[in-house]
């Protein structure tokens, strides 16, 4: 019986599984980065990866957790902007700001945002993916409470082992747009 056994083994030991999940989470974040046309491994569709259904179901909570941490961290970083300075680093004005009480308030207001970045980095171990998450993905989801991703099962199984494939993608970018039918216009007879 499988009572209280959470998660799928996926034919791997725990360290291999943890590395697999971290790599897949960073892969979906990195599909959103700026790419050039000459880059050999540019994603076909940003914000989407194709994997097996079981792997997609396992990494989805991890992706959602990272985005939630990033959204909360962005809110804290925005609160620190009122205490920041525009002076150039190393200048006399900057040194005065650095020694003042305002700097302490800025550092205290900014620290939860930095902690959020460190927590996400501890989960996925990819600095570039963390930057993409905080700079381009999390700002899109600031008004959304959760459910940042969707899993769509693909009809064709994987060649070789007949594994069920699925798409894991971010919600809101490739949504279907339903067109409303236009109401017919009737001419009103003048009497």
Predicted stretch roles:
Residues 1-138, 170-172, 178-191:
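Ribosome large-subunit tunnel/peptidyl-transferase-proximal elements
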Residues 8, 12, 147-148, 161:
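Gly/Ser/Thr-rich helix-start
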Residues 115, 144-146, 163:
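Short connector loops at helix/strand junctions that flank enzyme active sites
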Residues 131-153:
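Conserved short secondary-structure elements within globular domains
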Residues 149-172:
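C-terminal edge-of-domain segments
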Residues 160, 177-178:
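Intrinsically disordered, low-complexity acidic/polar segments
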């Amino acid at each position: 019986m499988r009572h209280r056994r959470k998660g799928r083994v996926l034919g791997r030991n725990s360290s291999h599984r943890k590395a697999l999940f971290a790599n897949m989470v960073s892969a979906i974040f990195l599909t959103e980065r700026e790419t050039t046309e000459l880059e050999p491994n540019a994603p076909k569709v940003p914000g989407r990866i194709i994997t097996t259904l079981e792997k997609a179901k396992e990494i989805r909570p991890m992706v959602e957790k990272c985005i939630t941490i990033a959204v909360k961290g962005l809110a804290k970083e925005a609160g620190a902007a009122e205490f920041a300075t525009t002076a150039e680093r190393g200048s006399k004005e900057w040194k005065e700001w650095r020694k003042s009480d305002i700097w302490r308030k800025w550092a205290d207001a900014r620290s939860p945002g930095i902690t959020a970045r460190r927590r996400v980095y501890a989960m996925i171990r990819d600095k570039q993916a963390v930057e993409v998450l905080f700079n381009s993905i999390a700002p899109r989801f600031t008004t959304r409470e959760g459910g940042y991703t969707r899993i769509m099962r693909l009809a064709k199984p994987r060649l070789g082992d007949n594994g069920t494939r699925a798409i894991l993608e971010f919600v809101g970018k490739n949504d279907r747009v339903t067109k409303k039918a236009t109401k017919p216009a009737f001419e009103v007879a003048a009497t």
